């Protein structure tokens, strides 16, 4: 007779997200506390990886890491010189980078109690985090995001992934970090386009979850577009808190179901990135994706026109795009190329298509199909808006 043994268990995860300034100041003991937050009272082994673009923009960073380790030799030791890892689209699209990180860590004989300290933008954190999650089924990962986008979103979450097979995040793992340290001093070398692009993720969580935060973004938009430090830090902290709240209380942190509220605007945004050969940055792609879904929701009768106008106005006020020519690219059969993003998104979700659309600022609904004629009309409206501005 067939038999079955049913099993059920729960695993609790917890990790802190710190906000600080100049974490590598030798007078600061924050990182020492991060490495020893379990109270193990020993010298921890740490392998540091640095985004190559960040290292080039901040020539003294690696020396600061070494000096900090020297000053706190009683708390941790660097197992190697900080190793530069390519950032941006290269990190997300080259499996060899993952292999290189794995080889470096393997040669150091890092164990499951050892630390990987990843300092960089979201793509570099994704690549390094993926590699760290594979070694011994998971080393302790401490992320130090160096972009607005990563400090708002990618750097504080529980996912790692790289692009492959023509799809965003085709290969990846769910692996919560040991800790996250959001150091605002790392943002000072960001080019304006990257700084502004990261604010798309703040707009995203405001639209789907928090009308009060959305209103603050509207008020602060001129200062945020200008890169003023205090409003920027406030927006990052608020966006990260909302993002983390969704992970912790949304009921599906590892995405076993089909709903993806934190992917508002991403089905089109990801496709635009692919269509542009990654010339379109993630933040800019998501901004246009949110604009498209906002107009679509309005035309579908889900979102009041006044709310749609506010969303589009905020995206524009922050200096983010609401239209890109790639929206109008077509396949040989005449189908819009961007529509293929719906199929990619469905495959990534698994099972039933589930796209988050706003029904009011701070509220959403899930839809299970998209009308291509409405998508075409929404793109036309965004093109007209783009010409007017």
Name what the model sees in each region.
Residues 1-114:
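ATP/NTP phosphate-donor binding region
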Residues 18, 130-223:
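A glycine/threonine-rich phosphate-anchoring loop and its flanking beta-alpha core
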Residues 108-131, 135-146:
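A short, small-residue-rich loop immediately preceding and capping a beta-strand
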């Amino acid at each position: 007779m067939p038999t079955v043994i049913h099993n059920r268990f729960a695993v609790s995860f917890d990790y802190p997200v710190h906000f600080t300034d100049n974490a590598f100041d030798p007078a600061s003991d924050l990182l020492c506390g991060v490495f020893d937050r379990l109270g193990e009272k020993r010298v921890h082994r740490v392998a540091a990886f640095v985004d190559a673009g960040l290292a080039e923009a901040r020539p003294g960073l690696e020396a600061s890491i070494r000096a900090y380790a020297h000053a706190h030799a009683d708390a941790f030791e660097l197992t190697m010189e900080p190793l530069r890892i390519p950032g941006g689209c290269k990190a997300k699209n080259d499996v060899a980078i993952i292999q290189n990180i794995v080889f470096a860590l393997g040669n150091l004989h890092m164990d499951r109690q050892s630390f990987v300290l990843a300092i960089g933008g979201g793509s570099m954190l994704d690549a390094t985090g993926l590699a760290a999650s594979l070694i011994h089924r998971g080393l302790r990962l401490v992320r130090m995001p160096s972009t607005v986008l990563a400090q708002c979103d990618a750097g504080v979450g529980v996912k790692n992934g790289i692009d492959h097979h023509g799809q965003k995040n085709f290969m990846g793992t769910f692996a919560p970090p040991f800790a996250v340290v959001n150091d605002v001093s790392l943002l000072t070398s960001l080019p304006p386009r990257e700084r502004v692009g990261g604010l798309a993720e703040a707009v995203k969580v405001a639209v789907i979850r928090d009308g009060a935060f959305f209103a603050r973004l509207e008020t602060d938009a001129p200062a945020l577009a200008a890169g003023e430090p205090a409003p920027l830090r406030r927006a990052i902290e608020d966006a990260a808190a909302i993002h983390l709240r969704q992970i912790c209380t949304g009921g599906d942190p590892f995405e076993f179901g089909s709903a993806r509220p934190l992917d508002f605007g991403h089905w089109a945004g990801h496709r635009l990135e692919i269509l542009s050969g990654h010339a379109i940055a993630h933040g800019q792609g998501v901004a246009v994706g949110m604009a498209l879904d906002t107009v679509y929701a309005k035309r579908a009768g889900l979102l009041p026109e006044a709310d749609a106008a506010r969303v589009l106005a905020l995206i524009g006020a922050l200096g983010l795009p609401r239209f890109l020519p790639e929206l109008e690219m077509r396949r040989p059969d005449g189908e819009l190329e961007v529509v293929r993003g719906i199929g990619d998104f469905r495959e990534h979700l698994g099972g039933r298509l589930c796209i988050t659309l706003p029904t009011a600022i701070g509220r959403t609904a899930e839809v299970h199909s998209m009308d291509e004629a409405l998508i075409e009309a929404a793109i036309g409206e965004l093109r007209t808006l783009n010409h007017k501005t």
